[in-house]
UniProtKB/Swiss-Prot annotation:
InterPro entries: Ribosomal_uL10 (IPR001790), Ribosomal_uL10-like_sf (IPR043141), Ribosomal_uL10_bac (IPR022973), Ribosomal_uL10_bac_type (IPR047865), Ribosomal_uL10_CS_bac (IPR002363). Gene3D superfamilies: 3.30.70.1730, 6.10.250.290. GO terms for molecular function: large ribosomal subunit rRNA binding; structural constituent of ribosome. Keywords: Ribonucleoprotein, Ribosomal protein, RNA-binding, rRNA-binding. This is Large ribosomal subunit protein uL10. It comes from Nocardia farcinica (strain IFM 10152). Belongs to the universal ribosomal protein uL10 family.
Amino acid sequence: MAKAEKVTAVAEIAEQFKSSTATVVTEYRGLSVGKLTELRRALGAEATYSVAKNTLVKRAAAEAGVEGLDDLFVGPTAITFIKGEPVNAAKALKTFAKENKALIIKGGYMDGAALSVAEVEQIADLETREVLLAKLAGALKGNLAKAAGLFNAPASQVARLAAALEEKKRAEGGAE
């Protein structure tokens, strides 16, 4: 690879680091091209699975301000650049790694911090953002309905009491 190509490659990888919400570093030793294609399909449109030379990736990470990943760039390494929801891509990687022992998750990077393998797997075990928001909305709606019922109960009780008193007065007034 010529020096100009290396400079261009480093700039492209650095841009991917900067524009990603998260990255996951994997070892792909022993995976066929067909399996890598299958993995890329499983990741979907929100993630890009890239294979590059470790020295170029290290330089790009440093250029992008990504720290703490240098130890992961040993051996055949690939990086998943996640543009959207990190949970979906992490789930896809974890599932694929379970089914294909040749894929090894080494770690990752999200929100300015390096992630261990365990942390990447914890992200994979989370519900998606939409599901969590729906659960929160459901919990809030239920509690708001209970609160509204509590606030409305005294008013309706007072209204029933006033109606009963009025009826009692009419009954007493009609009896006299």
